[in-house]
Amino acid sequence: MHNKKVLILGLARSGYSAALTLNKLNCEVIINDYNTEEKLNSNQINELKELNIKCIFGSHPDDLLDKSFDYLIKNPGIRNDHKYVLKANELGIPVINEVELAYRLLPKDVNILSITGSNGKTTTTTLIYNIIKKSGLPVHLAGNIGYPICSILDKVKSGDIIVSEISCQQLANIDKFKPNIAVLTNLSPAHIDFFGNYDNYKKVKAKLFKNQTSSDIAIINNDNLDSINETKDIKSKKLFISLTNKKDVYFKDNKFYYHNELIMDRDLMFLKGNHNVENAMDAILVAKLLNINNDVIIDVLKNFRGVEHRLEYVDEVNNIKFYNDTEATNIKCTQIALSSFNEPIILFLGGLERGQNFNDLKDYIKNVKVIIGIGECRERVREFANKNNIECFIFEHLKDGFKKMVEVSKTGDIVLLSPASASWDQYKECEERGAEFKKYVEELKNGKRN
């Protein structure tokens, strides 16, 4: 990758990190983003300009990409039908992404553990990283978890381990990328707007295994039929987790087993929900493959409080427990969250109008006593609640809904922000919605809200 001419399409963290990496390789780099400079990260832009990296913002000029370029590096959030991608294909210019770039620059004997899936991948990635780190093995966390792999290249040494969360958008433009251990947590319909249909989405997810050989490991959820079907022809050695059958790691009588070896009792885990049992099983299986001591596994699983914004326990106020699941931007995630509690639930539901079918929650709401509809689709939330005879209040903004929650909540309730909706009607990112919810909980605890 030295001395190449490269067009980077899209700034963000991955484009910025790729640009810095390529600059060190004496590449001629041009970075282009449709957003104007005012809408982008000024610190990133200033650093790029100081390095004499050409930046073109505010448009995608028709004449920018030509056959003089060696590579087009595309931000994962940009679709493959973008005009530059189509033109690159016509000109025979390879289209890759930051993950692929980083992979080509890593020491050959680095061990790569990659996790993908429709749900649970961030929690699973974090659990695996925490276990390996506590064991004392040299490990780095990167990928779709906030740290581009390019950003850690200078820290990685031969023999190190990289634990990387890989999204479907990142998988869409890999070429040679090959993890030593690849984990597929599960498959369910998601990102249909990006990939066109569920079949396309599943095929992209399965690309995580495409370069693996028989000496590499694939970890599959045996209880998820789509995962089984989509990986039936891969060359990797397949290992399985299961809640219901005796597999490599399995769950029986409320206990975790690796083959016939008892690992721990589920009650020792802080995290709620069967989905977190599955996440823990993936982490246990990876840990056993790395010969990590059971005491380390148990210690991490006992003390892990979850990933921020993913069914995150926030606090308890007046014997009412608050959970922030703002990352539940689809129906499936909210189904999982609702299945995690037996106590009465006050549910915050709604956000960006995407035509999401709230009726798909009807089999999961037996413990929901009040629904507070928020955001753009709040009227449809009320229709759903009325249809299922659940008391409902609707508000445009979360802050007003939170005030109503204070009025109607009682000792022993669970207050759950699990919106089954994206947040872009009011927030730049769903994390902002979660942070606002947590702020209101803190204010309530400190006596500032009533």
Please name every model-derived segment.
Residues C27-I45:
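NAD(P)-binding Rossmann-fold cofactor-contacting core
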